[in-house]
């Protein structure tokens, strides 16, 4: 078995060009996980994945009678809780260097084809703003660039996010079962949209369990729990945070980018999205939902 794994590693490793060497471990993990998982949750960073994961986790936290603030890992915790489905949460190659590295466009994602996949998307301008605060406030990077310049020009900004989304707009039709969930719809109709995700994966829970998961993951509740350092997952802050821009649960506002940019700057960013982003996601002209 070890020899087989070594051969697979060598085959994969030799296919990576110099620009991709930093991602070979992720690529190997993704090849294995995507083909063996019960389901995939795919997103660009800062699009709402942790929110969905927290709701899914809370379903099983209630079922197993665990502390309500525990956030289960759908891979690592399956040893302790075999009933957990194997759900693979991935940012694809955008996970490398916190989204500042462009996805390799020439690589198909054939290993996703047979696995039911939910893609969570968010208005890319809001995503870019959230990514900026992730990199500057939470991780301490990018102190030499202001918000607008990062969103407009920076790696991990709007161009990168739209490129990621367009790549997956081309790939999704090859996946036998897939579902696109917009952050904005999940925000305005959480019970309905989360219920769609639960149904899509064939997870059986009573309506009151789904309702409880949605209530637990309300923005205000998660933010207060994060401020108090009561959430078990490492991605949340450990408490004592006064600046909300340092929090994982930061604002959760639809169209929040308007609070940071001038009317002219917003128009320029929106014009780019209108012209370049694939319309399959439903963003573009007519931003009444933002």
Regions found by a protein language model. Name each.
Residues 214-270:
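PAPS-dependent sulfotransferase catalytic core
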Residues 67-71, 206-212:
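A short coil-to-beta-strand element that immediately follows conserved catalytic motifs
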Residues 168, 196, 205-207, 229:
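Alpha-helical subdomain
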Residues 50-62, 180-205, 213, 221-222:
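PAPS/PAP-binding and catalytic site of the sulfotransferase fold
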